[in-house]
Design a protein with these regions (language model features):
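A short, basic N-terminal segment
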Residues: 1-40, 341-343
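Walker A/P-loop nucleotide-binding motif
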Residues: 42-64
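AAA+/P-loop NTPase substrate/partner-engagement loops
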Residues: 68-97
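Conserved small helical "lid"/interfacial subdomain of P-loop NTPases
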Residues: 178-218, 228
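Winged-helix-like regulatory helical subdomains adjacent to P-loop NTPase cores
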Residues: 223, 237-299
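Short, amphipathic alpha-helical interaction segments positioned at domain boundaries
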Residues: 327-343
Length: 343
């Protein structure tokens, strides 16, 4: 990866939010979003929620429909990297984006009618603790109060969504919930190759120059991407970078993706901890101690350090830890097998 031009790498792991048209690789979901946007503009009340697996492109999808289906100003309400369940941080997120002081209600009312509020990764505003639902409940109140005059588009990973809806009334706040489906082999091929072509580099696959690769060879290659990634486009994009063996004279030499041969996760404690990272996306050690209040801090720390050494978890910064994205499908499959996640 160090040999790759920065701009090429960013095409696959950076935030790709700029687009002059609706994306063309999620026709079913776009049709649902168009219908929902039409109803939202009729001021019937309610937000649009997009759910899916982590790395499945929820933020990209929401940014695309927010800019292409609505005419109002866009306000992106961003979470702290490791998340927060403190209402004061939620208020500050609105203040930073809108550039004013005041309560959330005052800030929303200061924006033009029909403004669009994008809230990515709602699971980062939530915690599986008794006090962890306060911001979720506040969001429900905000949507029910303001969605007649303003538009709200949210996204959340599907596993957190299933849990949160069991203990809150937040489903009542949504006009529609759109589930992002796994990508097909063809969708993965189109997405990866369109980004590759944008990067301006050529490639060699199995000693065959790019222009000489036939349809069957492309099909064989991307079937493997589909199988190993479980159709998760974010995982597939990272796999593409990982399978670049070398770069020479603006030419990429790529190999077939290979499924990582990982032993079964047999430690029950590891599985339980990993399930919390799937639900919350990323966590600090302090958050973990709140989620596991009956465990000694030293014991929780030992689990985390073991999972980092096993490369299942990675440090995102000094205090924030997350799942290794390359191993996400393997971890999801392991948790489903252990019945810690729904299939």
């Amino acid at each position: 990866l160090a040999q790759l031009p920065f701009y090429y790498r960013q095409l696959f792991v950076g935030n790709q939010f700029t687009s002059s048209s609706l994306i063309d690789n999620r026709n079913r979901e776009i049709a649902l979003a168009q219908d929902t946007a039409r109803r939202m503009k009729q001021k019937v009340g309610g937000a649009m929620l997009v759910i899916g697996e982590a790395y499945s492109g929820m933020s990209y999808f929401c940014e695309n429909i927010g800019t292409q289906l609505f005419d109002g100003s866009i306000y992106r309400i961003l979470t702290p990297l490791h998340g927060s369940v403190r209402p004061v941080d939620f208020v500050r997120a609105f203040q930073r984006q809108i550039g004013q002081k005041g309560s959330v209600s005052q800030l929303i009312e200061s924006t033009p009618f029909n403004s669009v509020f994008l809230l990515h990764d709602i699971e980062l505003w939530w915690e599986r603790t008794p006090q962890g639902y306060e911001i979720i409940n506040q969001l429900v109140d905000i949507i029910q109060r303001y969605s007649f005059d303003y538009h709200f588009i949210l996204n959340c990973n599907t596993h957190a969504f299933q849990l949160i809806k069991q203990v809150t009334d937040w489903e009542s706040a949504f006009l529609n919930t759109i589930q992002l489906s796994p990508f097909s082999e063809e969708q993965i091929r189109k997405t990866i190759l369109s980004r590759h072509y944008s990067g301006g580099l050529s490639l060699v696959y199995q000693d065959i120059p790019e222009k000489e690769i036939n349809a069957n060879e492309w099909e064989t290659l991307f079937k493997k991407y589909k199988l190993i990634s479980n159709g998760n486009i974010g995982v597939a994009l990272r796999m593409w970078l990982r399978n670049i063996e070398r770069v020479k004279n603006q030419i990429l030499y790529i190999k077939d993706p290979e499924e990582l041969q990982m032993p079964p996760i047999e430690e029950k404690e590891w599985l339980v901890v990993l399930s919390q990272f799937v639900l919350h996306k990323q966590l600090s050690f302090l958050q973990l101690t709140r989620i596991f209040p009956n465990e000694e801090k030293a014991r929780v720390n030992l689990w985390v350090q073991d999972l980092i050494r096993a490369n299942l978890l990675i440090r995102l910064n000094k205090i924030t830890i997350g799942i290794n994205p390359y191993l996400y499908p393997y971890i999801i499959n392991s948790l489903k097998k252990a019945q810690l996640l729904n299939s």
